[in-house]
């Protein structure tokens, strides 16, 4: 299918990968951006097709075109748990509220919870994500229905490779890998849960398995002070040092949280090219603190932006996360220039693409990349007066401005209508699940 997005203000990367806004014609053919032509240079550049030969034309009037947003850390199935463990300390929230509910969940519960999360993602402009979930096959089926792009993992737990639960979950992971090996939109990775749930021997085994099958690692690390203290007491090192010692970082790794980290930890992350997926809202809401993002950026660590799950955030809306990441570090550092709007936008686009290992495929509006794009309505109070679009994205937008979502050249939402999911059915089923599982 040939799609032309005509005369639209477009957020583009320049040669320094700093975002600029230019009016462009954007040409999509099948799943790929064929050309991005600035309107003032239209006569000088040959377009791949015209508005007369396009199969579909989208007007750029009052619209801003962005690369699709990338959520670097999520638990999409948790959306039905929104509000069931608020204002609790991390350990009480996780062990007394979340894990007991998860133990009762069926495959259908996982699928419906995942559908709700995917719906929220589409409506707020997320087109790709890195997720840790329960029951990977029903989760994958929901993602296929929705049409989003994702890397999925099962939280792997246990004392070692002979642990019964570890065997079951690794088997599930490998079955999902086999199913989605040729799938263009879904990739399966290894998900050692955290150092308090996935012990060193199991981490070592997962590292070897990931290396053998060329799989990425998705893991929670150094999320709370207690996690770090317990790890040092048990293993004599920090969670990041433990993961490195176990060999996990020999594989491309996404380390979620990394709130309580030493300079030695940061050196390990940089040396091993580990991406940090920072989740500022979840970290603050659970009382875990603020990750030292400016120090990470100074060390040239790739930092991408995530939401965590709706049980701890309580939203998967990346515009909310963008606002917080840009504001919290200005306040903590007492420096207004700390984490600019453009830096925050980079974290949820190009840095997220790098976290996924897809920096040459997605994350920016460029010819040759996959057509993962979103259009925002700028004829809204949050954009007025329309003088600095990127600042508006960070400081005044709330996600309701997202009008159209395209993934892999397929229109998933247009004029705020999601085409791939049944919203009313999803709402109905999730309210039933919440009532049953939280009695």
Show where each model-derived region lies.
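Acidic, glycine-enriched loop/beta-strand segments at the rims
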Residues: 10-23, 286-287, 353-390
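N-terminal metal-binding scaffold of metallo-dependent hydrolase/deaminase domains
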Residues: 1-50
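C-terminal cap of metal-dependent C-N hydrolases
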Residues: 370-427
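Active-site gating loops and adjacent loop-to-helix segments of metal-dependent hydrolytic enzymes
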Residues: 80-112, 146-161, 166-167, 225-252, ...
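Metal-coordinating catalytic core of metallo-dependent amide/deamination hydrolases
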Residues: 138-259
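Alpha-helical scaffold segments that flank or form the walls of functional sites
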Residues: 82-148, 169-182, 430-439
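His/Asp/Glu-enriched, well-ordered alpha-helical/loop segment
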Residues: 245-252, 294-380, 396-398
